Amino acid sequence: MSRRKQTNPNKVHWDQVFAGLEEQARQAMMKTDFPGDLGSQRQAIQQLRDQDSSSSDSEGDEEETTQDEVSSHTSEEDGGVVKVEKELENAEQPVGGKKVVEHEVTENLHSDPLLGLCQCPLCQLDCGSREQLIAHVYQHTAAVVSAKSYMCPVCGRALSSPGSLGRHLLIHSEDQRSNCAVCGARFTSHATFNSEKLPEVLNVESLPPAHSEGPSSAEGKDIAFTPPVYPAGILLVCNNCAAYRKLLEAQTPSVRKWALRRQNEPLEVRLQRLERERTAKKSRRDNETPEEREVRRMRDREAKRLQRMQETDEQRARRLQRDREAMRLKRANETPEKRQARLIREREAKRLKRRLEKMDMMLRAQFGQDPSAMAALAAEMNFFQLPVSGVELDSQLLGKMAFEEQNSSSLH
């Protein structure tokens, strides 16, 4: 059975971003460069005007174009022509002004072409360099994280910790292993991770001395690979990434302290932290409204369904074994009231399954793939409370049939 792989639409591809910025910079420099004397430049401007007028006359005979496109196109060209004319008038001024113009042109040519073009893909903020742009995008993680939980930007699922969010984001990637969002290197396995790093980014000499002592200092392939660090947000980064280490130095002390503490966290401290997170999650769920609970459950079900679609046979076998062990332990410690409620739920599930088995094959497949249809079917079956005996079940079914007949007669 084929498993459909889904991509993460919020993944930042730095190579594509900077390639587009460099192309924009080159185009901007080419547009401001007009070789030749002033007479030839004026002839070029006149040719542009003639082309614009001829194209506007021939547009009505050729393909159909909207009025908005034509007006925006002509306004942009007219604006460019007026701008060039103003520059030429300034160039015809005395020698002092001409020197100033030439000095500005040479300054623009020798400056960084990416200056002012390093825009954040999330908020369109201009950054001075690539390092500042990467650090700024990392700051967006504070906007993603709320005071209570960590929200997935793809499906909106609420998770209790940054590590859980990072592991959850893998189900939205192209495969189970993603690429580093800071340096852009794709890793397909733990063995080939270091060899597939970008050499211009992963320079060992540029590593900070404060972090070069740990096991994740990227000194060679003989060092054991440590699990990746997933920060609190939409970025997936790796421990061995030098760009990520530089990025950590630019963050606030609290963020650096959090990342270092997670890397060197002992087992007992980790267990205590997980217990605190579970307690906080339980208290948060106890205080949520019924609408919030329903939305959370729908998000969890959808995320679990997507995750199970992408798991392998070995992962599925391990998950089923864990579920059986947990179910056995839970049933051994449940109270009589919880056992009665569980039996009622199982009885409802069996009724729903038998109802689906009586349907047509195509309709059954449609119901199985549509969660809203399944919810509607369950709501229809639960129109009355689950009875205790079969006699009450028959009486309630008869009452429901009579109620439906009354509604149909009133409609006719």
Swiss-Prot record:
What function does this protein fulfil? May be involved in transcriptional regulation.
Q: Does the record bear Repeat in its keywords?
A: yes
Which residue windows does the record flag with biased composition (Acidic residues)? 58-67
Stretches of the chain forming a coiled coil according to its record: 257-366
UniProt superkingdom: Eukaryota
Q: What is the lineage of its organism?
A: Eukaryota, Metazoa, Chordata, Craniata, Vertebrata
The UniProt entry's GO CC annotations, sorted and at most eight, read: nucleus
Gene3D superfamilies reported in the protein's UniProt record: Classic Zinc Finger (3.30.160.60)
Q: Does the keyword Hydrolase apply?
A: no
**Which region ranges are annotated with the description Disordered?**
26-83, 278-319
Q: Which organism is it from?
A: Bos taurus (Bovine)
Q: Which molecular-function annotations from GO does this UniProt entry contain?
A: DNA-binding transcription factor activity; RNA polymerase II cis-regulatory region sequence-specific DNA binding; zinc ion binding
Q: Name one GO biological process term.
A: regulation of transcription by RNA polymerase II
Q: Which InterPro entries match?
A: Znf_C2H2_sf (IPR036236), Znf_C2H2_type (IPR013087)
Alphabetically list the UniProt keywords: Coiled coil, DNA-binding, Metal-binding, Nucleus, Repeat, Transcription, Transcription regulation, Zinc, Zinc-finger
Question: Where does it localize?
Answer: Nucleus
Q: What is its main location?
A: nucleus
Protein name, entry field: Zinc finger protein 821
Zinc finger feature spans (C2H2-type): 116-140, 150-172
Similarity remark:
Belongs to the krueppel C2H2-type zinc-finger protein family.
